[in-house]
A protein has these predicted regions:
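Generic protein-terminus/edge-of-domain signal
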Residues: 1-73, 77-79
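A short, Lys/Arg-enriched amphipathic alpha-helix from helix-turn-helix/homeodomain DNA-binding modules
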Residues: 146-149, 171, 191-192
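Structural motif
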Residues: 69-71, 78, 94, 104, ...
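Short beta-strand His + acidic residue motifs that chelate non-heme Fe in jelly-roll/DSBH
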Residues: 71-73, 89, 95-101, 107
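A hydrophobic/aromatic-rich effector-binding and dimerization subdomain
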Residues: 2-34, 98-160, 178, 183-187
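Short acidic-glycine-tyrosine-enriched beta hairpin
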Residues: 76-90
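Hydrophobic/aromatic-rich alpha-helical bundle segments in the mid-to-C-terminal region
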Residues: 49, 188-191
């Protein structure tokens, strides 16, 4: 990613921005459960801690940085992050990341439409959160911040251990995560 003299991110032309299910994977997503879970270092270290601008046509991503610092490129803006930080990237938004090698945290990629369908039934006002890109540097020890990691760990367990009802449980946990994101958005001033 290149930065102009005024601090704005300079993106390549729209037709050159790659589309991925997961960054760097050219094959279509093969997940039968509609979501993926990764620790940030798993993929970022393979790319020297820089994830170039790209987008996901049908997937949203939630990144929670629990340790370290970095920058998020979201559409045409670049945002500084320091842990704890949360980034929500709805489907169709160009994004990229630069991390320091001491970063840790999680990334969940999920099919946006099924998540929106579930939200539409259980909490229609959650749709705005699901469709709004955001970068938030979070307060340490805040009650909503503290509620994030247990949800991410539950999502990880569900993703790593296939079982009957995995899609239902996964979407339910992702919906609970999005409720926490909405609460954080209501109590904090997001960067985006």
């Amino acid at each position: 990613m290149h930065i102009s003299t005024d601090g704005k991110a300079v993106l390549p032309r729209a037709h050159t921005i790659p589309h991925y299910a997961l960054y760097g994977d050219n094959a279509p997503a093969g997940w039968s459960n509609m979501f993926n879970f990764e620790w940030i270092p798993e993929r970022s270290s393979l790319y020297e801690w820089e994830i170039q601008p790209h987008l996901h046509g049908a997937f949203l991503q939630v990144l929670f940085m629990s340790e370290g610092e970095g920058h998020t490129l979201l559409n045409d803006s670049r945002w500084a992050m320091r842990a704890p930080a949360l980034v929500l990237v709805p489907a169709g938004h160009v994004h990229g990341f630069e991390f320091n090698p001491r970063v840790n945290g999680v990334v969940v990629t999920a099919a946006q439409r099924p998540l929106e369908s579930m939200a539409g039934v259980v909490m229609p006002e959650l749709m705005q959160t699901l469709r709004t890109p955001m970068v938030m540097n979070l307060p340490e020890g805040g009650r909503h911040t503290e509620g994030l990691m247990p949800l991410f760990r539950a999502i990880e367990r569900e993703w790593r251990m296939p079982a009957a009802g995995q899609v239902a449980a996964g979407l339910s946990l992702l919906t609970a995560l999005m409720v926490q994101v909405a609460r954080l958005n209501d109590t904090l001033e997001p960067s985006v």
